Structures are given as structure tokens and as C-alpha cells.
Amino acid sequence: IQKSPRITVGIVYSNDFEQLGIRLLKTKDLIDFGAGGRNSLIARGLNYYLSDIERLGGNLDFGLTNNFHLGLNIISEQIASASNEFFSIAFRKNQKTLTEYRNIKFNVYLNYTPGRNVFGYGVDQKYGKNLHPEFVFKYTAGVKGIFGGMLDYDKIQMSYKQTYLLNFLGNLETNLEIGKTYGIVPLPILSAIPSNQGYSLKPKTFALLNYYDMVADAYLMGHFEHHFNGFVSNKIPLVKKLKLRTLATFRFAYGSTTSENVAANRSNINYNSPDSDIYYEYGVGFENIGYGNIRFFRVDFIWRSPLSYSFMYNPYSSKLPDFGIRIGAKPSL
């Protein structure tokens, strides 16, 4: 609605099934088009853990500079289970057991990307491929009593993302995220460690976890991906001939859930938290797979850490594999 300073407005209404156990920190809480393994044609195990969400929301984003944005979201959500027979989100509050909730939330976010190359006009700006850090801070307040809001809580989240060039060793992509929820809240408001039951790669998710296998109200996650480019592959004749490139990945999650939130849980989800043992996954892979100049694909071989002795499987969840193979594609020319 204004060019300088750049101000944009977004409004959305949606009524759909969503997978809330796939991503944590979002700046604009309007629609998450990647929300859920339901978009995967081929997936591991069954997925009964979808939520039925009716959402009305608005976003106001101030581009104070090209690389510093301040935003405000106002969201009204009616949250219920998509199938009460298989997935309960019941919650005990004020001597009552609730099975669906009206969540009214306000959040403010800051997005700082120093050194990013920004160009173009209109709503969708373009960004250059130069390397730069990204810092995100977000505060969310759940408000009770306004517009029928039933939940009262505060949530703080922060993330840091950057790619480092390590000379001939290649480049290292890093992503750290931390968050804390204050208040007694039901499962959909807690932070489920992001999982991916599909066989395709999805950023910032754990490939060998089922949805809601791990839940926390305080968490720390790290995702690291190192692209060796030609440092390793040039030393292996067959790999060099096929023009493949090698990579290595490591990701971890640590978190805890307060006893008050555990006591209020009436869902059929076990509140496993990676507090006594950090959960991690590691892997190696090949990228630049294709023919000629069309080389969009990569294959990752992934292993996971041992599960905690206290870990309990959720109903209808498949047994976690110790090893998996995932395929990714990144079209670019």
C-alpha cells in the first residue's frame, strides 16, 4: 500500500486440514502452504494427526529498510481434530475437558537480513544470491476473552540462519532456532519437533520422526548442511566422472515440557520431550544428479540417534526406522 517505507497488507480466510507438526517459526501466520505430509504422494506410515482449522487473519508488514522488517499478525483460529476417532487434542482447563479451541493471537516479528541484495517493486520483491545472515525474532500472545478466545499464553521464538564459505572445503549452511511457551496450553499450541514422514526432503524437519513423536514447550534446534562441492568428489574417479557432489548433514533437537502442561494433557499423544537425551540425525549424500546441464536432484542417506529409554510411541504411529533414504530436487539454472 506504500512504496517508501514499504508497507504491505495481507488478509486470509481458510478452512482446511493442516499438519501442525511440521514447522515451528513462521513470521507471517496466515497460510503455511507446506503444512503437512498430506501433500506427499508417497509417505512412511500412516498420518492420522491432522487438525481441522478455520482461520481468519491479517498481516501488516513495515519494510523500514530493504533488510529490516517489522510486522504484526492478528489471527483467529478455531482448532479441532480432523478425526476424533484417531487423534485427540483434548485438554483439561478449569475443571473442564476441551476438545476444540478458539485461539485468538497477536504476534509481532522482526526480520533482519544485513547485506541482502533486494530489487524489484510490488508485493513480491526479488532477492540476489549473495550470502548474508538472517535474524528473526517473534513474540506471540494468546488472548483470552476477546472475540471468544479461550487460551492465555505467551510465546517467544528466535532464529539465526547463515551460509559460510570455507574456501576449498565448500560451504556450510547453518540454522539455529530457539523458543519458549509460557502458560498452560493444549497440544496445538505447544511446539512439536518438526517431522517429515514423506520420502522427499523438507528443510528444517527430522526425516526419521513421526508427527508429534516429540513435543516441548521450550526447545532448541540446529540444522547444519555442508556442501563439499568438488573437495571430496574430485578424489573419487567414478563420482568425478558422473559429476556428482558430496554433502553431509547434521540436525539436533533439545527441549522440555513443564509438569503443568503434561498434567493438563488429555490427548492421545504422549508428550515425549528430548530433554534427557538430545535427539539428532546425521547423514551423507550426493547432489548435482542428472544429465548434461540439467542436474536438479540429490539423494541423502540418513541415520538417527538412539531413542530415550522413556520414549513412548503414539497410537497409530509407525515404528521409527534407524535409517532412511530421502530424495530432493532444487530446480535452478
Where does each model-flagged region fall?
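Exposed, low-structure sequence patches enriched in small/polar residues
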Residues: 1-333
